Amino acid sequence: FVTILSNPAAAEDLTIYTYDSFNNEWGPGPIVFKRFEKQCGCKLKVVSLGDSGTVLNRVILEKANPQADILLGLNNSELEKSFSYDLWEPYLSPLLAKVPTDLRVDKKNRVTPFDYGFVAFVYDSQKLGKAPKSLHDLLDPKYKRKIIIENPKTSSPGLSMLHWTIAVYGEEGYLDYWKKLQPNLLSVTDGWSAAYG
C-alpha cells in the first residue's frame, strides 16, 4: 500500500520511505522512481529502511515531526496498526477505479493499493525433488532442521506466515501447529536478508 503522511515533511524534494527490497537494484524502485520524477517534474529522496514493519515503526516514531511525505510498501498485516496511530492523509487516487474491489481495503482512502503478493516457501528444486503442497506437509520429519522462517516480531513476511497459520488452523490450533513444526526449524531469522541472503 502507498500512504500519504499527515503533516508531511515540508521540503522541495518529495521524501519517500520504503522497504529495502522494493528499492534494491533488482527491485522495481529505481525504475519506478525515475519515471515518477520525470512525470511529476519533482525530485525524489528515497529512504530504504529495512522491511515494511521497520518503515512503519520509523513513521510512528516521527509522528510529531514527520520526515517523509509518502510511505510505500505497507502490507495487510500492518494496516490496522498504522490506522490506530492516525498517521495518514486521505487521498482518492483517480486510478483507484482500476483496482479490483477486493483489494480496496480502506473505505477512508488512507491507503492506496499498488500491488499484492502471496505468502510462499522458497525451496531449492535441485535438492528437493517434490515441493511441499501445504503447511501440513512441512511437519514431515524429512524436513528436520531444514526450514528457515522469519520472526513475526521483526519481519513482515514472518508476520504474514504467522497469520497464514492462524487462517489455516484457527485461533485454537495454530499454536499446536507451531509446536509440531519446531523440530523442523533450522533457524528463525530477523528478516528477509538473513533468511535468504
What are the residue ranges of the model-derived segments?
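Sec/Tat signal peptide C-region and signal peptidase I cleavage site
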Residues: 7-11
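Short, well-structured alpha-helical segments in soluble
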Residues: 57-64
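Short, polar/charged alpha-helical segment
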Residues: 17-45
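Extracytoplasmic ligand-binding site segments that recognize negatively charged/polar headgroups
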Residues: 12-13, 19-29, 50-54, 66-197
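Class I S-adenosyl-L-methionine
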Residues: 33-37, 60, 83
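Bacterial N-terminal signal peptides
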Residues: 1-6
